[in-house]
């Protein structure tokens, strides 16, 4: 499959931003440890957001019916613990905001919900598509405390960034990079040079 880089994620996001904002998360499924299906509805339209965090196949997309059949995704009789946690906090909630982190393969979906004491709570579902470090993380936006994640990361795996419930969420370390707009502009300029006839 094509390399799912930050530009691909940004293009996918820009194309679907109008659907994301205000969409209600109706159903959450986790067929395997690394496959997720989020059934959403907005403006009378239903879609299924597919998230794959396999190290060699990480990507996200809205599934067409034919593609859903080809993937042969079967919901287990007993859902994983993380799936049940996501259902507890997010099923029935609407996406209040969404964004892609600049120059990263990270998609964030924000939710405004209510806790057990009927207090407003702002949550973030963070989808990190970064090869062997790919993960899905749910955290509280007010405190940045992680509620749960698809894969816990302990100190033995990462000295810089541990990921598990109860710890503070921090973004992965970033390397110096060029903004999306500059990359796109540079590619356009290269194309112009290649196809400009000599005078």
Regions found by a protein language model. Give the residues of each.
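Acidic, proline/glycine-enriched N-terminal capping motif
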Residues: 1-184
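Conserved small/polar residues in nucleotide/adenosyl-binding loops
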Residues: 195-199
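Conserved phosphate/oxyanion-binding catalytic-loop motifs
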Residues: 183-194
